[in-house]
Amino acid sequence: MAALAMAALLPGPATAASTVTQVAAGLDSPRGIGFVDGRMVVAEAGHGGPNCFFVPNGPPFPFCIGDTSQVSWVNTTTGGHEPIVKHLFSISLGPEGTLGASGLSVRDGKIYVLMGSTPQEAPPDSAIAQEEAGRLISINPSTKSWMSVAKVGETDFNFTLPFTQPTQGVYSPGTQEHDANPYGVLAVPGGFYTADAGSNTLDWVGNDGKIKILHHFDWRDLDPNNFPSDDVPTCVAIANGSWWVGNLSGHLYRLDMNGHVTQVVPRNDSGPLLHHVTGCTTDSKGNLYLVNMFGPGIPFTPPFFVGSVVKYQTGSGQASVLAGNLFTPNMPAIGPDGNLYVTAGSICDAAGTSPAPPGAPNPCAGGGKVLKISLPRA
């Protein structure tokens, strides 16, 4: 099961590129973020649950399923938060983190959320996994109820089955894991674009729930031991008449109206600025904002765990770092005040349980968070 591998490091202060302030804390693995009529909503992936199982020929630790995921209102003035819907599917993958409510997008007063994972990779007797894993769901905030829109994870997993799977530790072009993990969603008139981090696909989901695979990202790292060794698309945004897809590999792709795919490398004088992207959004001026959950360097050793937020001007090609030294930031959204809001501490549970070794500083103190990054008004 493809997951965004996670670990811990105490972050330093944000860079001086923009003012960064904490809006809320005490969230449970916060991921997607958006606004409904000016009110903030956040998807919380949760912390799994008590129903554990071992994957055959898998890692030496159990995966644990529960109903601890939820979608919550967040008060940007007081920092308070309360669930709109709760008891959603969540699966803890041990040291690899948690999957649950992931990408979030708002359209016409409804909240649309992608649930991570897929039912094929869960025990068949897990009712909540079979009914909710990998689903695109629609939430009515007025009634605090939800309904399923489409079986994105199930469809994407089935798409991967005809592929030969990569050989572990060997460069394997043309291969694809049999996997799915729907992650990013963008609601538009008529339907939804979804990015699947497991199947490496960009999908179109119609309002009727019908799913079409628009593109399969088949890049493979020449060094199969790098993290990640495939693209792992995590987000999709629209700017200047093109679709932009961010990837955990650090790749950014532009897809035009004719279906042409071009890799774009935002950079400044220091070099390329994208490392491990988990979220992206745009503003009304065509600027693209991308969240690096992790930084450069050797995977899972400092300073790898320090993320950043990058601004890319899709018209001019100029790029800059808005904020750095952020602990596992995840997804962004432009707020009604014109500033950028980002979930952070996305591997942290609400209680702030430390993932660090005993005696080390706790980077999750205060639990998952929402940060505000000031944007210029010009």
Which residue stretches match the model-derived regions?
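Secretory targeting and sorting signals
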Residues: 1-16
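Beta-rich, blade/repeat-based domains predominating
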Residues: 26-38, 68, 90-110, 157-192, ...
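Short loop/turn segments that connect beta-strands within beta-propeller blades
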Residues: 75-79, 139-144, 205-210, 255-260, ...
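A gly/proline- and charged-residue-enriched helix-loop-helix capping module
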Residues: 99, 107, 114-169
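Loop/turn residues immediately N-terminal
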Residues: 199-201, 249-251, 295, 347
